[in-house]
Amino acid sequence: MSSYLEYVSCAAGGGSGGVGGDVLGFAPKFCRADARPVALQPAFPLGSGDGAFVSCLPLATARPTPSPPAGPAQSPVPQPAAPRYAPCTLEGAYERGAAPASAAEYGFLGSGPAFDFPGALGRAADEGGAHVHYATSAVFSGGGSFLLSGQVDFAAFGEPGPFPACLKEPADGHPGPFQTVSPAPGACPKPASPTSSLPAAHSTFEWMKVKRNAPKKSKLSEYGATSPPSAIRTNFSTKQLTELEKEFHFNKYLTRARRIEIANCLQLNDTQVKIWFQNRRMKQKKREREGLLATAASVASIKLPRSETSPIKSGRNLGSPSQAQEPS
């Protein structure tokens, strides 16, 4: 309020009957060319030290103070005691006995659907300019306070209001300064998630990935019956296979305690270790059988040419009596 109103103290001293007080002056935008200072007198007499209030509100025509009618002297009617700083509004007469002036004479807005606003800020329904309305009912106190509770149109004084058009009241009835302002989409960039900023190599290493075969799905047979799904085969990692092969090299058969210990070390269960050793023993027996057959075949192929060229067999055949003597 200090940017629009200025308080000028022109008090001359208060106790010796001198008139002292405060002069309330508005900025030039509040007054028209024909504005004249008007003395505002409260409805009750002020005490010592309280001066009159002078305002620069524009008046259409000057109203002379009507003189009281001449008649027989009457005893003054006692007035009820009023508080020292009772509110004195502008809606009544400026001077005692003067007729109340309409709101149009002071350049104030009247009440109507176009200017019916629930808050202190508003605009006309059919106007595009910035019109800020303040209250017309003013309250003055002895200390120089100035309160507003009605509506004043800055557009009536020929200048735009001090507030921009973005603070105008929306059509739904909520005040402009109190409504929630939502930013435009894309105005505030969204922070990237921490998982998206990290590269894929830092989240999972290659050696952590254990390749598993996809489980087989049951297929429909010719008669529409589904075949039972086969058991899922466990894919061991390189580290697990190395440890199992090393253990199999020393022990072909494991005890239950040793099997549980190996399963805990390799993050496997007891059944997986047991089945692996069974399959490994069967593979070893198969290799041995294949190896024995290959060894026997190689030995037979080596001994066969030696038996054909043996001198003993050839001498026996040559020196045999059946072959030496033939019947004549």
Swiss-Prot record:
Record feature DNA-binding region, as residue ranges: 229-288
Main location: nucleus
A GO CC term attached to the entry: nucleoplasm
Disulfides per UniProt: none
Chain span(s) of sequence motif Antp-type hexapeptide: 204-209
Subcellular location as annotated: Nucleus
Alphabetical UniProt keywords: Developmental protein, DNA-binding, Homeobox, Nucleus, Transcription, Transcription regulation
Keyword Nucleus: yes
InterPro entries: HD, HD_metazoa, Homeobox_CS, Homeodomain-like_sf, HXA1/B1/D1
Region (Disordered): 304-328
GO molecular function annotations of the record: DNA-binding transcription factor activity, RNA polymerase II-specific; sequence-specific double-stranded DNA binding
Segment forming the signal sequence: none
SUPFAM superfamilies with a match to the protein in the record: Homeodomain-like
Any one GO BP annotation for this protein: neuron differentiation
Segments of skewed composition (Polar residues): 307-328
Superkingdom of the organism of origin: Eukaryota
Keyword Cell inner membrane on entry: no
Pfam entry (one): Homeodomain
Cited function: Sequence-specific transcription factor which is part of a developmental regulatory system that provides cells with specific positional identities on the anterior-posterior axis. Acts on the anterior body structures.
Family stated for the protein in its record: Belongs to the Antp homeobox family. Labial subfamily.
Name listed for the protein in its UniProt record: Homeobox protein Hox-D1
Gene encoding the protein: Hoxd1
